[in-house]
């Protein structure tokens, strides 16, 4: 029975992956590559009335809602509001693996990454980030009872038999490396759904992700899933500092005018009652507000 329930859960979680590889707010599939006009991406999008966003299948940031047949999530819904205020009424989603988001943006498969991507100095050298929309700590998804007693990245280091699951291209692999988790103890998955399945199957003893991601996954599993959130949990300490990640939108580096215009509208929205009400269904609270943290500060961090 547990196996049957597990399969049903994984099927429900992965419908976004099976339903379509692209989506728009008006249920139109995205086809081909973006082709900005000579006037720039922003002008082209305004003229067309629509724009493509790249996303990975990771709730609560960006995922396919199979019931509504559209991409949704905290990052996507904020983008819809901000872009509409900029005169762009339609959003077309392009689904890809997390590790392919930046290459896809650079290849002009889409014009914005809306996936809750953390702002890091390394990524700042590849893309232009907006200011963040949220800040959050880390968590582990483990088997019920947490048999390897993993409550931090450091616990993985201390136990050579422990395997830590991470999503390809996500920040968690970087955190693990910086706290000296051996590469041989890391198991790389293409997405959060696969990581959940990997923990259930014993391929990994813990899946490292944002606390919001783990909360969302646990909210979609039943008592028979055999999983739990590792509690308590201690965020990794890197270069003497506790880690708190900040997610934002990413633009091509030659789309600075677009990024600046987006940022201006974003600043008017983040922290408002409208913003809080919009993201509450995805598990976001005032605790996740980015406060005075900016992309410039995060990009300059050492």
Task: Outline where the language-model segments fall.
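Periplasmic-binding protein-like
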Residues: 135-139, 222-263, 286-302
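C-terminal motif of bacterial Sec signal peptides marking the signal peptidase cleavage site
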Residues: 16-20
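Extended ligand-binding regions for polar small-molecule ligands
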Residues: 22, 76-85, 146, 162, ...
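Extracytoplasmic small-molecule ligand-binding "clamshell" domains
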Residues: 29-115, 125
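Flexible hinge/capping segments at coil-to-helix
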Residues: 34, 144-163
């Amino acid at each position: 029975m547990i196996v049957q329930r597990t399969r049903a859960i994984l099927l429900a979680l992965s419908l976004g992956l099976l339903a379509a590889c692209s989506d728009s707010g008006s249920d139109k599939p995205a086809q081909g590559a973006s082709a900005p006009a000579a006037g720039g991406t922003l002008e082209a999008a305004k003229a067309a009335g629509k724009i493509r966003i790249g996303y990975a299948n990771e709730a609560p940031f960006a995922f396919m809602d199979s019931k509504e047949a559209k991409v949704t999530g905290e990052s996507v819904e904020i983008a819809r509001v901000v872009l509409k205020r900029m005169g762009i009424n339609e959003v077309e989603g392009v689904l890809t693996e997390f590790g392919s988001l930046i290459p896809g943006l650079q290849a002009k498969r889409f014009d914005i990454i809306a996936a809750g991507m953390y702002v890091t100095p390394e990524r700042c050298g590849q893309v232009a980030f907006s200011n963040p929309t949220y800040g959050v700590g880390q968590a582990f998804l483990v088997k019920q009872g947490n048999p390897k007693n993993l409550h931090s990245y450091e616990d993985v280091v201390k136990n050579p038999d422990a395997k830590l699951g991470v999503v390809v291209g996500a920040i968690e692999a970087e955190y693990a490396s910086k706290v000296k988790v051996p590469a041989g103890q890391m198991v790389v998955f293409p997405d959060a759904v696969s990581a959940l399945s990997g923990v259930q199957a014993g391929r990994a003893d813990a899946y490292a992700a944002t606390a919001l991601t783990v909360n969302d996954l646990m909210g979609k599993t039943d008592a028979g899933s055999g999983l739990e959130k590792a509690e308590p949990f201690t965020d990794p300490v890197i270069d003497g500092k506790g880690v708190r990640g900040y997610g934002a939108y990413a633009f091509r580096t030659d789309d600075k005018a677009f990024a600046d215009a987006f940022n201006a509208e974003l600043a008017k929205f983040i922290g408002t009652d409208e913003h809080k009400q919009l993201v509450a269904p995805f598990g976001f609270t005032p605790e996740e507000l980015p406060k005075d943290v900016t992309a410039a500060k995060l990009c300059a961090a050492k």
